[in-house]
Amino acid sequence: MQRSRGFRSKSRRKMTKVVREGRSNPITNKLQKFEEGDLVHITINPSIQKGQPHPRFHGKTGKITDKKGKAYIVSLTDGNKAKELIIRPDHLKLQTSQ
């Protein structure tokens, strides 16, 4: 039988989260607002699968270009190629220093 190469394959360390008692995902992460042109860091929250980008983009920084429903369109360069990702705010953090 051929092994599966699913969306979360080869991401055992990257896609794990330490469970701490009395702590869950704060609602403020879901309610974050971003403006067009904001620089954001992509930090995947492994406990929320919806709106999650591919693990290769974890730790990258991009620019908000548009909003699509609850998610944001983030443009970044992957090598020399420009890419657009549709990511929910649970997996984004605003860059504080410019």
From Swiss-Prot:
GO molecular function, one term: structural constituent of ribosome
Gene3D superfamilies the UniProt entry points to: Ribosomal protein L21 (2.30.30.70)
Record InterPro entries: Ribosomal_eL21 (IPR001147), Ribosomal_eL21_arc (IPR022856), Ribosomal_eL21_CS (IPR018259), Ribosomal_eL21_sf (IPR036948), Translation_prot_SH3-like_sf (IPR008991)
Keyword Nuclease annotated: no
Region feature Disordered, mapped onto this chain: 1-28
Keyword Ribosomal protein (UniProt): yes
Keywords: Ribonucleoprotein, Ribosomal protein
GO BP, sorted A to Z: translation
Comp. bias intervals (Basic residues): 1-17
Pfam families, A to Z: Ribosomal_L21e
GO cellular component, one term: ribosome
Superkingdom: Archaea
Matches recorded under PANTHER family: 60S RIBOSOMAL PROTEIN L21
Family, similarity comment: Belongs to the eukaryotic ribosomal protein eL21 family.
Stated name of the protein: Large ribosomal subunit protein eL21
Species of the source: Methanobrevibacter smithii (strain ATCC 35061 / DSM 861 / OCM 144 / PS)
Lineage: Archaea, Methanobacteriati, Methanobacteriota, Methanomada group, Methanobacteria
